[in-house]
Amino acid sequence: MRNFIVTGTDTEVGKTYVSCLIVKSLREAGINAAGFKPVACGDRQDARLLREAGPKDLTLDELNPVFLRNATCPYVAARLENTKVDEKVILRAYDALSAAHECVVVEGVGLSLIHI
């Protein structure tokens, strides 16, 4: 099984809903699947929902390695918080999930071409 990404053209268009359904369906079919929300801004509700759909033993930091408190796009949130989104942190978390699961469903941020 291959890993894949769920993306959308905006926020609040159903990416989390679809990602959770895919993870849950794969697990019900006997496939060791997990969700992954590389970057979240504002809150971690999407990551919590992905954890409910997938393996319960994963921490929010494993499912969502970059969390920015400002509820805006990642680039602006990082600037407001005087930080940068470290792609290496995201890749390490993704690699760890990929090594431990047959399938990782990656939920993208609000816009398909958003700058992080």
Spans of model-derived segments:
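Extreme N-terminal starter segment of soluble prokaryotic enzymes
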Residues: 1-4
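Fold-independent oxyanion-binding glycine-rich loops
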Residues: 8-10, 38-39, 107-109
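N-terminal phosphate/diphosphate-binding loop that engages ATP/GTP or pyrophosphate donors
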Residues: 17-84
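Switch II (G3) loop of P-loop NTPases
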Residues: 102-112
